[in-house]
Amino acid sequence: MTTATTAARARTRGRLFDWKLGVGIAAVAGLLCLSLLTGVYDIFGGDGGSEMFAITRIPRTLALVLAGAAMAMCGLVMQLLTQNRFVEPTTTGTTEWAGLGLLLTMVAIPGASIVTRMVGAVAAAFIGTMIFFLFLRRVTLRSSLIVPIVGIMLGAVVSALTTFIALKTDMLQNLGVWFAGSFTSVMRGQYELLWIVALVALAVFIV
């Protein structure tokens, strides 16, 4: 049995590391280079180009990579917990709960720092995900499609509540900017907490 298990793991690892993975890595590397070279400021001919490159371009690119890795890790963990391939943060209401947490943090603490906003968004996303799992325990799952449908419905309710609160507090425009997901304003000193994602990814890979 040990030999069979080892052989199965070797075949699985062989399927993971094939030419498709190489193409994907090359494409991602190309996009990273494109992100580093994209911007209004001329980093090659302008004064202080290297400083601007270190302050804005590198942090922006790293923030993009780490945010994407965070979404991927969330999707992986959710799929492992629910044993459903259709489950991800956008189909479970997690992103909507994060938006609600961010909005409530800004309303309660107008001058909140970026760290405080992140903590509020993460806490709300965690609570919302737990509520989603509680819903699943009370729903008869006749099909694998029921799980994302429940999540999308829950997310729609949370999104409507968030929009209502934003409208009442005159923060609807800010809410639209947040949900646009723009990384253009990311600078050094604003993204370092995202390195926690790399540690979590390493822990999941080891386990």
Language model features with spans:
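Alpha-helical transmembrane segments in inner-membrane proteins
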Residues: 2-207
